[in-house]
Amino acid sequence: MINAKKLMKMAKKWQQRAALHRKRISFQRSSVFTSSSSTVEKGCFVVYTADKIRFAFPISYLSNSVVQELLKISEEDFGLPTEGPITLPFDSAFLEYLVKLIQRRMDEDTEKALLLSISSARCSFQPQEQQCSTTQQLLVF
């Protein structure tokens, strides 16, 4: 897992690179929102899903281990973006579900199960010779 300090540094670097080509305008505060606007509220970071939906999260979400794992997976799959947004290899429905779990302050067991589910699902998309040795589990809440 990535420690919080390194993750904050990575997020700041991504934000700075993304901000080079756009102006920032403040708007009403919201904890998580989707938008087609190219501006982002101060104290938030933006990610895009695999289906091109834009999500803005408060920086405080970076301390959540599930969000850290998603960013780590994104970095492994897509690398650090030099130009353009951070893209997560998940669809918007999954990210909306994850946001609801985070907002409800999921307990430690749920968080561990979600992390296991993410890594299992990720392994199932790899070629047969590179598959992980973990067994797949279905996560239902």
From Swiss-Prot:
Source taxon at top rank: Eukaryota
Keywords linked to the UniProt accession: Auxin signaling pathway, Cell membrane, Developmental protein, Growth regulation, Membrane
Keyword Coiled coil included in the entry's annotation: no
Record InterPro entries: SAUR_fam (IPR003676)
GO biological process assignments: auxin polar transport; auxin-activated signaling pathway; stamen filament development
A cellular component term, taken from the record's GO annotations: plasma membrane
Pfam families cross-referenced by the UniProt entry: Auxin_inducible
Main localisation: membrane
Compartmental location: Cell membrane
Tissue: Expressed in hypocotyls, cotyledons, petioles, young rosette leaves, apical portion of inflorescence stems, stamen filaments and petals.
Membrane-related topology note: Peripheral membrane protein
Chain's role: May promote auxin-stimulated organ elongation, such as hypocotyls, stamen filaments and petals.
Family stated for the protein in its record: Belongs to the ARG7 family.
Additional remarks: Plants over-expressing SAUR63 display elongated hypocotyls, twisted inflorescence stems, and increased length of stamen filaments and petals.
Name the record gives this protein: Auxin-responsive protein SAUR63
Gene name linked to the record: SAUR63
